């Protein structure tokens, strides 16, 4: 713009237009500037970036939400009153109740993909003073978990890759939660036979692994089938349950065969009615999974291609819905549904 102004001044033309343009430019710079990337979002509690993510924290009177996407995607949710979230964390709380012959308050729990610690916070609330530690690769998210999501200070969080952490420690756990799959971003090194074998080796006798898979698929050879088959080829007993109202699916795996029976016995003795109802729902909807031939290994784990296939399918389903409306009701009917 400076070069343009110099040019027109030298040509002795359009002086009034130059002055007006410069004033408008200055006015726009002063009034039109926003340091918020999501400029349409109001009243964000926090907005910033880390090495790995764009981060938003928003809150209401009831809850605090972390999102790592601008338009969509809730990565973590914390209920200020400490109740159930209605999300996959609630279903995953069945894992400690599947472990036989040990009080839940005495269990050691490891969370790979700690996020803001919602699962750890809920386990502490409902199961007592469990020994919980987490691994989270994004240190900024861990900082936010302490500041906004009430993660207890005595819950240790290591800033590290989940698989690298398992390679570095010899500790065994009663429950290992794998929650490192975000949207279509699935780390290949945490989706292979070799990785899940490593998880199994870090479980105590009777221990349970719970995996949060956040994309439903209903086609042969989709990403969920690859993950489930891979896990079922490592563990002797695998159960899955779909999370109501979302695309999440929880998968429970163990070497002991009485997971659901042990869960039912523990649920009968729960004192919290809300948690008890939630656990009964999970137990009733759990489906045994038999191993198939879709395997991912360190040498071949096409998670990006499989993830994009699911996204393409979701887009096609949405487009088909609106296409049917257009064909039946025309443009006016389509506009009414938007």
Regions found by a protein language model. Name each.
Residues 1-11:
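Membrane-embedded alpha-helical segments of integral membrane proteins
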Residues 13-76, 81-82, 88, 94-100, ...:
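Soluble small-group transferase modules, centered on the S-adenosyl donor enzyme superfamily
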Residues 83, 90-210, 214, 218-228, ...:
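The AdoMet/dcAdoMet-binding core of the Class I SAM-like
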């Amino acid at each position: 713009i400076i070069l343009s102004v110099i040019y027109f001044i030298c040509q002795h033309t359009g002086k009034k237009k130059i002055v007006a343009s410069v004033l408008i430019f200055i006015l726009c710079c002063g009034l039109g500037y926003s340091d918020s990337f999501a400029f349409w979002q109001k009243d964000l509690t926090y907005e910033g970036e880390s090495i790995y993510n764009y981060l938003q924290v928003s809150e209401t009177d009831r809850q605090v939400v972390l999102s790592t996407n601008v338009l969509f995607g809730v990565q973590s949710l914390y209920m200020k009153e400490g109740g159930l979230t209605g999300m996959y964390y609630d279903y995953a709380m069945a894992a400690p109740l599947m472990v036989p012959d040990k009080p839940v308050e005495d269990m050691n729990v490891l969370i790979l993909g700690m996020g803001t610690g919602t699962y750890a916070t809920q386990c502490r609330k409902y199961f007592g003073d469990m020994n919980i530690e987490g691994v989270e690769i994004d240190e900024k998210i861990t900082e936010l978990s302490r500041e906004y999501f009430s993660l207890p200070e005595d819950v240790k969080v290591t800033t590290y890759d989940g698989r690298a952490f398992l390679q570095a420690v010899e500790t065994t756990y009663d429950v290992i939660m794998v929650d490192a799959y975000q949207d279509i971003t699935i780390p290949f090194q945490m989706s292979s036979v070799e990785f899940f074998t490593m998880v199994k080796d870090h479980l105590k006798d009777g221990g349970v692994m719970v995996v949060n898979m956040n994309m439903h698929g209903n086609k042969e050879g989709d990403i969920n089938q690859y993950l489930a088959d891979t896990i079922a080829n490592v563990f002797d007993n695998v159960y899955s349950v779909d999370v109501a109202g979302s695309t999440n699916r929880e998968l429970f795996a163990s070497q002991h065969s009485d997971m659901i029976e042990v869960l039912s016995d523990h649920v009968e003795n729960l004192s919290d009615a809300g948690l008890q109802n939630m656990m009964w729902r999970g137990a009733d909807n759990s489906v045994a999974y038999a191993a198939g031939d879709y395997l991912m290994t360190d040498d071949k784990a096409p998670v990006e291609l499989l993830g994009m296939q699911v996204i393409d399918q979701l887009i096609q389903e949405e487009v088909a819905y609106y296409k049917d409306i257009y064909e039946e009701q025309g443009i006016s009917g389509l506009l009414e549904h938007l």
